[in-house]
Design a protein with these regions (language model features):
Chain B
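Periplasmic/extracellular loop-to-transmembrane helix junction in inner-membrane transport proteins
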Residues: 1-19, 33-42, 79-83, 185-194
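Interhelical loop and adjacent transmembrane-helix boundary motif
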Residues: 1-7, 168-208
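Membrane-interfacial helix termini and adjacent extracytoplasmic/periplasmic loops
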Residues: 3-6, 61-98, 169-173
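Transmembrane-helix boundary motif in ABC transporter permease subunits
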Residues: 19-49, 62, 77, 112-114, ...
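Hydrophobic positions within alpha-helical transmembrane segments of bacterial inner-membrane proteins
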Residues: 20-28, 32, 58, 62, ...
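Transmembrane alpha-helices
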Residues: 21, 106-109, 113, 117, ...
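C-terminal transmembrane helix and the adjacent membrane-cytosol boundary/short C-terminal tail
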Residues: 41, 103, 107-121, 125-129, ...
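Non-cytoplasmic
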Residues: 69-70, 147-185
Length: 357, 227
């Protein structure tokens, strides 16, 4: 029995057609896709706030929606927590009353999460008497998380909860989120259009494009295929490598990535693990053999696993243990005979790398 | 002021209070329905609710009189089953005022509900609140200032009601003679113009006060709506 199974089909008046089915069995799944790919519609269908023309939804074997048999459980009885991009706290209630809202309206049997513990884990103690209008964006999002968890959900769904926050806050809220999932073991479906968020947090990713599922799998795998990346809508693939053992060395930071050495510009080693480095595909130089006598510090050895032409450029996926995307000209790709299986070295200046934590 | 004048003031307040309170539950129900509901024939409901705004009050009063008279379709039932007489009593005045003030109350309440983000109601439902619980814990509290403003508007409108009241309730000293009717009666007497002044001034003050409070509440309501 899967945790969640969904099958839905809906044709909007605008002509947009949603036709998605998938099953979830992971703790932390990300629903990924560009804007307008149908992510929010899918969440609304699962939560029960939007009823499509044809659908069936099962959660832990319980039938929530089955249009063929006229079954439709109201959102109030689905036990699915929903966190919105703009938090949607009740403006007329204090933080404390917001947190307890779900608790008061859910059957006592579902009150599996201790109020005091939520306040503790999400560090809400100092906010309880405040009203939502006196909270910052990050604080609101934390209260919204707490409110959803306290309603005792069997599934927690989040609709781009980080999209309206600035970058430094995103990492911290993600941390709270991961702490929460670890503490209460609530399966989570996380909607985002940010590849970085998917790579950092999700165990499994379902990729949507134009109302259809185009890929699913572990993040590194599912996002490595060009089709799902919806490049028409974003600036192309993002390089985000998971790094380990970051230490300060003489004049730089040293780290390991998939068993190879990595040089980073000098800075403070990150406090959290795992951490990630980000760089642009255009900053990667591809060479067929290792070259010496260059100032470039990073020489990552790997094998081409994919070549994807996009609007006058070629994106080459190199498997170095993780996927590195390089952007090269069509001439270069032809001259170097870049095809799947080719052994290459990716050359990367240390100063092109940005540490993300 | 004479004791008759004070009686008129007391009656006016009593009638206006009853009219505004009696209409409130219906105005909340219809206002919410108009703000949220999507159904065919909504325009018809709106038209009927707003009719007293555009009809001459005397015509509205006439229709009410026909319906509520002891032999009228509603009056006969009330008289026969409950032994209640509406026309030419202060209840009649209250009912006429209620009908006249109803469109104003519905309009204010409807606007207040429209200003409540429907996604907050959605959030409440995903947190386990049913339809009624969502309404009473989220929609109504968020619209409360608009509801109060609508109530005050209807109250003020009732204080000034003349045309429909005189048709349904008559102009009986001590029973249905409210401030406007008392002013009218005085003004028709040879030396009455001068004696009507205190009542006129009081009426202006009451109306201005009600309007000011209603305006203030509506402003606070708009500040309250989340960005």
């Amino acid at each position: 029995m899967s945790l969640l199974s969904l099958q839905c089909r809906h044709r909007y008046a605008s002509g947009f057609e949603l036709d998605v089915s998938f099953e979830l069995n992971h703790r932390f799944t990300s629903l990924f896709g560009p804007s307008g790919s149908g992510k929010t519609s899918v969440l609304s269908i699962i939560a029960g706030v939007f009823r499509p023309q044809q659908a069936s939804v099962r959660l832990n074997g319980r039938r929530l929606l089955d249009t063929a048999n006229g079954i439709c459980v109201t959102p109030a009885r689905r036990a699915i927590g929903l966190v919105f991009q703009d938090a949607l706290l009740f403006p007329h209630l204090t933080v404390e009353r917001n947190l307890q809202y779900g608790r008061r309206h859910r059957a006592a049997a579902r009150r599996t999460v201790a109020y005091a513990r939520v306040v503790d884990v999400l560090e809400l103690g100092g906010l309880l008497r405040r009203y939502p209008r006196n909270l910052s964006g990050g604080e609101r999002q934390r209260v919204a998380l707490g409110r959803a968890v306290l309603s005792g959900p069997e599934l927690l769904m989040m609709d781009e909860p980080l999209a309206s926050l600035d970058d430094s806050l995103k990492g911290r809220i993600l941390e709270y989120l991961q702490r929460m999932i670890a503490e209460w073991d609530i399966p989570t479906l996380f909607v985002t259009h940010s590849q970085a968020e998917v790579r950092r947090a999700a165990e499994w990713v379902v990729v949507l494009q134009q109302g259809r599922m185009v890929a699913e799998g572990p993040p590194d795998e599912a996002l490595a295929r060009p089709a799902p990346l919806a490049w028409g809508n974003s600036a192309g693939p993002v390089n985000l490598l998971r790094i380990e053992q970051v230490t300060a060395a003489e004049g730089h930071l040293a780290a390991r990535v998939a068993g190879q050495d990595l040089f980073l510009p000098l800075g403070k080693p990150p406090a959290v693990s795992p951490s990630f480095v980000q760089f642009r595909p255009a900053d990667v130089i591809v060479s067929r053999q290792d070259v010496s006598g260059l100032s470039v510090r990073n020489h990552l050895h790997g094998r081409v696993c994919q070549v994807a032409p996009v609007e006058g450029a070629i994106f080459v996926a190199v498997d170095i243990g993780q996927i590195v995307w390089a952007e090269v000209t069509p001439q270069a790709a032809a001259e170097l005979q870049l095809a799947p299986g080719a052994e290459v070295v990716c050359l990367l200046k240390a100063h092109c790398l940005t540490l993300v934590s | 002021m004479t004791s008759e004048a004070w009686t008129a003031v007391r009656l006016s307040l009593q009638v206006a209070m009853c009219a505004a309170l009696g209409g409130l539950p219906f105005a909340i129900a219809i206002g919410y329905w108009l703000a949220r509901g999507r159904f065919a024939g909504k325009w018809l409901v709106e038209a009927v609710v707003n009719l007293p705004l555009v009809l001459p009050p005397v015509v509205t009063g006439y229709v009410l009189l026909v319906l509520l008279a002891p032999r009228g379709p509603i009056g006969a039932v009330l008289q026969g089953w409950l032994g209640v007489k509406i026309v030419f009593t202060w209840w009649g005045a209250a009912l006429a005022s209620m009908v006249m003030g109803f469109p104003l109350m519905v309009r204010a309440i409807r606007l207040a509900f429209q200003a409540v983000d429907p996604r907050l109601e959605m959030a409440a439902r995903t947190l386990g609140a049913g339809g009624a619980a969502t309404f009473f814990t989220v929609s109504l509290p968020l619209a409360r200032r608009g509801v109060t403003a609508g109530w005050i508007l209807a109250f003020a409108r009732s204080l000034g009601e003349f045309g429909a009241t005189i048709m349904v309730a008559g102009n009986i000293e001590g029973q249905t003679r409210t401030i406007p009717l008392a002013v009218y009666t005085l003004a028709n007497q040879p030396d009455g113009m001068g004696r009507a002044w205190p009542l006129v001034a009081l009426s202006v003050a009451l109306s201005c006060g009600a309007l000011a409070i209603s305006e203030l509440l509506e402003r606070r309501q708009s500040l309250h709506v989340p960005a």
